[in-house]
Amino acid sequence: MNRLIFLFSAVVVLFAACKTETIFIDSSLPNGTFSAAKSGTLVEQNGTGTAGMVELGTDEDDVQFLRFGSNFTTNLGTGTVTVYLSTSENFVADPANGNPDLRQVGPISKTGESYFKLDPTAAAKFTHVILWCGSANIPFGNAALN
Amino acid sequence: MKNTGLLLAFVFFVSGLTAQSGWTREPGQGYVKAGVQGFASDQYYNLAGDLLTTSQFRQQAVSLYGEYGIGKRLTVIAAFPLLKVNSFETTEAVAGIGDLRAELKYAILKGSFPVALSVAPELPTGSRNNYSQNKTTSFERINLPTGDGELNVWTTLAASHSFYPFPAYVSVYGSFNYRTGFNGSAFRNQVKAGAEIGYQIKGKLWVNGRLGAQKTLGQPGTPVDFIRGDGTEYTSLGFGAAYSITKKLSLTLEYQNYLDLIFARKNLYTGHIFSAGISYEWKRAE
């Protein structure tokens, strides 16, 4: 019996010694401080209430992100609003040639601050951010990145 | 519902193309009509009045409409979209019932120059949010509600005149739509006015022409809930025909479109609206 107690205690001590603190890292958010390289102000289109600041920059690991500021608003009650990087303020789709003037970033699900991780890094040719309703094919707003 | 043409401007719903008149039903008299309507357009006027070419929006609707005289001066009216099927060409179709319009109409003047006042609340019985899945992009969907989610009240003053024995009539009306809001968004009130002339051919076929115009009152909020018709303005032009199969039964055909004649189009899909129906009318309770 004493041997069993000793063995159980040894196992408990062994597990206690191996216990480590688990830290979850959300890779969709910047690690450390986000530094903006370019920024712009969203211009509303089609009465969607789109407004706010967008920034293109990197975190402390040099990973690139697109940031929507805490003042970002748009009408999300209409359905999905998708974020694109574009070579101009106009949404120019050319799927037959791989949409060279667009890069889909992803759907935006809330107003206020949001980050989109850009992997691979966005090409320098993308000068604008466009908010786009893909089902109706109408723009909700755009911002020039300067 | 808010427009008698396209219900929600962006999400648009073809509702009953029924006109307003100064006539009321005598006690026990009634009229019912079942109709189907169809609409498709890729021409959208945004809130600023700029025309955009979008994906094609489509709507089909089945509706019921009825009038019944409950007193010498009182008529009850109901218009109920039984089914609305909405889609873009890029999305799957979504369906639902529409908003029920219940109306009480009071005859202020009767005789050769009837004048009537009606109050018509529109109840939010339709689907307030109805998301349609994009056919090609899995994360894309768009809200195509079949009701606007609000309780609004139309108040209408209408006058008519029959040129009997010449088989023709004319009606004019003015309406005020008191709107409330949905989900924190306050909708602006609207005014609407219109006229209709009708003429009977060989005792069997009534034909009519209609002109209407709607204006939104007040300044827009931010953001404007445009999918629920806030800010919708237009001038409408329509034509109709009703052919009597029997003394009580008629077939109806109607057409409507929009233009910029009185109020320019804003927050509206514009295009041809076709409807067909069958109506039954009786002179006393049977």
Regions found by a protein language model. Give the residues of each.
Chain B
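Residues on the lipid-exposed face of transmembrane beta-strands in outer-membrane beta-barrel proteins
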Residues: 34-36, 64-68, 78, 102-106, ...
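Outer membrane beta-barrel transmembrane domains
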Residues: 45, 192, 196-286
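Residues that define the transmembrane beta-barrel architecture of outer-membrane proteins
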Residues: 58-62, 94-100, 147-153, 187-193, ...
